Amino acid sequence: MDFAANIPKHHSLDHLARPLVTVDDVLISHKNGQYAILLIQRRNEPFESCWAIPGGFILENEPPDCAAVRKLTSETNLKGISLMPIGVFGDQNRDPRGWMITMAYCAIVDQTAVNAFAGDDAADAKWFDLKWEKSGNDMSLSLTHDELVLRALLRKQEVTTSLGPNIRFDQLENYGIAFDHAKIIATAIERMIDFQDT
C-alpha cells in the first residue's frame, strides 16, 4: 500500500524548513596524562585552510552512525573506530551556507596505534596537543601542533530540557577553528573526559 499517496495536502511538509544534516567526529588521544585531538585542514570554502574536526553531509537514506564512520574514514583514512554520540548542534548561524544540524560523535583512541592521513576534501590531517582550562563556567581551549596554535574561549550554560538537564557552550572567542567546532570539542571534553575523571 502506498501510504504517501493517501496523505492529505494539508499534512504536506512543503511549508516546513528543511535544514541539511551533517555528522562531525571528535577523535581524542590520551596517553601519559596528555591529550591530543585529530583535526583536518579544510581544502574548500567555507573556512578554506582552517582546521576542523572530520565530518560532512549525511547521504540520502544513510543512518547517521554510518555517515560518521564513512566521513571519518574518507577524510582521515582511519577504520574500525568505535564512535559514541555526544550531542546535536543546530544553531542557525553555525554554517555560513545555510541551516545545518550536525550530530556529533566522539572516540578516545591511542594516536600511536592509528595512522591518520588526509583524504577526500581534507588538505591535511594532524594531531594537535589538546589543553583546556576552566574558570567558573568559562573554558579556554588551546590546540597546538609545532608552531601552529588554535584557541577558543567558551562559556558553559546548564539548560533544562524536556529530557532533563543538559549543557551547551557559547563561543566567545575563536582563533583558527572552523565552524562551531570549538563548541563540539568542549562538549566532548565535558562528556567524555571530565566525566571519566570523576
Residue ranges and their predicted role:
Residues 4-53, 65, 80:
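N-terminal strand-loop-strand
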